[in-house]
Amino acid sequence: MKTITFDKLLLKTAFCCMASDGNIDKREIVLIKTMCGNSPLFTNFNFEVEINNLVSKLNTQGKDFITHYFELLKHSVLTEQEELTLIDFAINTIKADEQIEYSEIKFFKVIRHNLNISDEKVLAVYPDIEQFLEQDIISESYLEKITNQYFDTLELPQFEQIHLFDAHSLDKLKKDE
């Protein structure tokens, strides 16, 4: 299994969370770009190139891209702080479009299952995500079942390449809503 740097894992996590409901919302793009820009982990980093590389891979690989992400996450050795950072990127991305779909909760539960941090520590930082942590994944077979259910209902469209826009365009987008 190929290893991945933590910054790439964070970006891939946020990207997969953004696409997990079958829709890429501009607010999610802006949030991910902002999170990457605010993090010291992303240096010498061209967001537009990196995010569009992920779009292209998702478009060509489809569900295999998501499966590969889960495998990368499963085999990553992360510190507790890195796990909290990954959860932060995931939760904030899921909430960015102000619509939390059940597919996104299922997706997060699969992510959560691959982390070692306790629910108590997660809830201490994110007390409002209890529904994301409810224990319905109780065995490997159930995890496999919920993962398969996620993939069975997932319809990934061909996503457009992402073009960044300036703050003025973002303000206009917010006013149009």
Give a label for each model feature.
Residues 1-177:
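Small-residue-enriched hydrophobic alpha-helices in membranes
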